[in-house]
Amino acid sequence: MARMGRRPGPSTTRTLITAAAAQRFTAVGYDATSLRQVAADAGVDPALVRRFFGSKEQLFTAVASALIDPRRALAAIAEGSADEAGERLLRYFLSLLGDVTQPGPLLGLVRSAVTSEHAARVLREFLAGGLLREIAATSVNSERSGLGAALVASQLVGLAVARYAVQLPSLTAADTQELVRTVAPVLQYYLTGNPISVKEKS
């Protein structure tokens, strides 16, 4: 009988489960995903999924947190000139969504939120409780940080839904630079109160 390999540690197991869940949510959506299916995809016992995450909602939140890392989003805002914070944040967000023909890891969460009220609520709570709070805390314009952060989220989520889920022709046809040129000044205004035109980049 072949000798079994060493069992993965808790950190590795959690990562395997999160990755399997992200793929499952992308493939079939939130409502059609079960903890048992995720466990099978990850090659672990369903009890381990419940032990690490408790419920499907908590697992979805963990996937969102792994994909939309607030620290990276904040780094995108904070690193470099304040006049380009909106552009950096948008480029980071678009990199997670990927191209229309080659979806990125975030697209599964967006599609799940469109088709499932449970997923939409979990994503809203994650944005409000994590990402938006951090953006508000580091906003250049502190007087409007709360509203500005919420408007940033509305712009980004709206863009994701319209371009990748609904697939409005004008948005799907636009390339990254065109989106940055058009949308980044809006995000910049939400963040700082000062819209900045985006320069053409080679």
Put a short name on every predicted segment.
Residues A47:
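Key DNA-contact positions within bacterial/archaeal DNA-binding proteins
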Residues M1-R3, K199-S202:
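Short, intrinsically disordered or compositionally biased N-terminal tails of bacterial proteins
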Residues A120-R124, I135-Y190, N194-K199:
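Hydrophobic/aromatic-rich alpha-helical bundle segments in the mid-to-C-terminal region
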Residues F93, L106-A113, V152-L156, A160:
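Short alpha-helical scaffolding segments that buttress acidic/His motifs in well-ordered protein cores
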Residues M1-V44, G54-Q58:
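Basic, helix-initiating cap at the start of DNA-binding domains
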Residues T61-L67:
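Alpha-helical DNA-contacting segments of helix-turn-helix folds
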Residues R72-L107:
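Hydrophobic alpha-helical connector segments
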Residues L97-F126:
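Amphipathic alpha-helical segments used for helix-helix packing
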